[in-house]
C-alpha cells in the first residue's frame, strides 16, 4: 500500500505508536507481581451488588447510553464466535456485556460479568486492565494472561476517551482462545472511536463544529476530523482524527486561533455555515495540507454574525459535498479498504 505525501492519514485510536507487545506484556506481568498477585489465584466471584452496580452505571450514564447501540452492532459482527462484548468504566469494572449463549457460562467461570473489576491490579495482565494502564489498544491471548484461570480467553480491548481526551472506560471483545481472529482488535478500535465521536457530537451539540478530511467522501464517516468552537471562535476540543490530522495534542490546539489551525478567518467560515448549511469549502492545515471541510451549527438563531460578512463559498462546493448516504455498520470489509490512509 502507498501513502500519498502530504495527505493526513486517519487517526489510530492511540496517538502514540503501539508499544512492542513483548515489552508491553512483560511490563504488565511485572506490575502484576508487584501488587502481590499470584498466577495460581482463583478469580474473585463477588461482583458489585445490584444497587451498587446500578449506581455505577448511572454515574457513567453518558458512556453507557452512547456505547450500548455500538456494542449491539459490534456483537452482530462477531455473533456465533463464542465471544462477548464488554464495556467497563475507567477503573475496569464491567458495566455491561453482550455475549453468545454458549460462551456466557464459560465467562462466568472466570468472573467476566457485570459488576466485576478487571483492573490489572485485581486480575493481573489482561486486555481490559492493561489497555487502561497503557492507554492504548491491547490484545492479550491465552497464556499471555497473568492468572492461569484466565488463559482460556483471548481478549482485544481499546480505551474510550471523553471529548477532552480523558479515559472514561474501555470496550473489549473476549472469547474462547480457539476463536481468536487478528482482525478483532481492528473492529474494537473502530467501535471505540465511534463511541468517542458520538460522545463528542453530544457534548458539543450547540457548538460550531468543523467536519474535515483530505478526502470529501470521508466527511460524515467514522474517519472525519471533528473540531468544536464557541460562536466567538474559541477552540473547544477535537476528536482523535482531528488531533491526528492537525498533528498536535489537545493542549497545544487550545492555545491557537481558528485561522492558525485552518488558514481562514472564523467569521467567514461561520457565515458560510449559517447561509449555506451543508456546503463544503477548502481549508488549509498548519502542515500545508488542504482539506475538505463542512461547518455545522445547530443553534444559529442564538447567534447573529457580524454585519457585512460575505459568504466565501467556492465554485466547486457542490462537487465537494459529501454523499448523503447513511453510514454503514462496522464490518471487517469496511476496515480492509486497501488504503494506507485508513490504517
Feature locations, PLM:
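Intrinsically disordered, low-complexity terminal regulatory regions
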Residues: 1-142, 152, 161-164, 168-232, ...
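PAS-family sensory/regulatory modules and their coupling/dimerization elements
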Residues: 143-144, 152-157, 262-324
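Signal-transducing coiled-coil/dimerization helices and immediately adjacent hinge/linker segments
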Residues: 198-264, 319-343
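Short, surface-exposed beta-strand-loop junctions and turns on beta-sheet-rich folds
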Residues: 101-103, 242-245, 299
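Amphipathic alpha-helical regulatory segments at dimerization interfaces
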Residues: 70-78, 130, 244, 260-268, ...
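Sensory coupling linkers of modular signal transduction proteins
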Residues: 171-204, 219, 294-343
Amino acid at each position: 500500500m502507498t501513502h500519498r505525501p502530504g495527505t493526513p492519514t486517519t487517526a489510530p485510536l492511540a496517538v502514540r505508536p503501539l508499544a512492542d507487545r513483548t515489552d508491553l506484556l512483560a511490563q504488565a506481568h511485572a506490575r502484576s507481581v508487584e501488587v502481590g498477585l499470584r498466577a495460581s489465584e482463583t478469580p474473585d466471584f463477588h461482583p458489585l451488588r445490584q444497587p451498587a452496580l446500578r449506581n455505577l452505571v448511572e454515574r457513567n450514564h453518558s458512556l453507557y447510553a452512547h456505547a450500548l447501540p455500538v456494542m449491539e452492532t459490534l456483537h452482530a459482527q462477531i455473533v456465533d464466535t463464542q465471544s462477548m462484548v464488554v464495556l467497563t468504566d475507567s477503573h475496569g469494572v464491567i458495566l455491561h456485556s453482550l455475549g453468545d449463549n454458549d460462551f456466557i457460562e464459560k465467562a462466568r467461570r472466570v468472573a467476566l460479568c457485570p459488576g466485576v473489576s478487571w483492573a490489572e491490579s485485581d486480575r493481573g495482565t489482561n486486555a481490559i486492565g492493561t489497555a487502561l494502564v497503557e492507554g492504548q489498544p491491547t490484545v492479550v491471548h491465552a497464556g499471555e494472561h497473568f492468572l492461569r484461570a484466565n488463559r482460556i480467553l483471548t481478549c482485544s480491548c481499546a480505551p474510550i476517551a471523553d471529548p477532552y481526551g480523558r479515559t472514561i472506560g474501555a470496550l473489549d471483545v473476549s472469547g474462547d482462545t480457539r476463536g481468536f481472529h487478528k482482525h478483532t482488535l481492528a473492529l474494537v478500535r473502530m467501535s471505540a472511536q465511534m463511541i468517542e465521536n458520538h460522545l463528542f457530537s453530544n457534548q458539543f451539540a450547540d457548538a460550531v463544529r468543523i467536519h474535515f478530511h483530505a478526502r470529501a467522501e470521508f466527511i460524515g464517516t467514522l474517519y472525519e476530523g471533528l473540531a468544536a468552537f464557541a460562536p466567538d471562535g474559541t477552540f473547544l476540543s477535537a476528536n482523535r482524527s482531528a488531533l491526528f490530522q492537525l498533528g498536535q495534542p489537545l493542549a497545544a490546539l487550545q492555545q491557537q486561533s481558528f485561522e492558525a489551525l485552518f488558514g481562514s478567518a472564523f467569521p467567514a467560515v461561520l457565515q458560510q455555515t449559517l447561509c449555506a448549511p451543508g456546503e463544503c469549502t477548502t481549508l488549509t492545515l498548519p502542515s500545508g495540507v488542504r482539506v475538505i471541510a463542512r461547518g455545522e451549527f445547530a443553534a444559529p438563531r442564538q447567534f447573529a454574525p457580524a454585519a457585512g460578512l460575505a459568504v466565501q463559498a467556492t465554485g466547486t462546493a457542490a462537487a465537494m459535498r459529501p454523499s448523503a448516504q447513511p453510514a454503514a455498520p462496522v464490518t471487517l470489509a469496511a476496515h480492509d479498504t486497501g488504503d494506507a490512509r485508513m490504517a
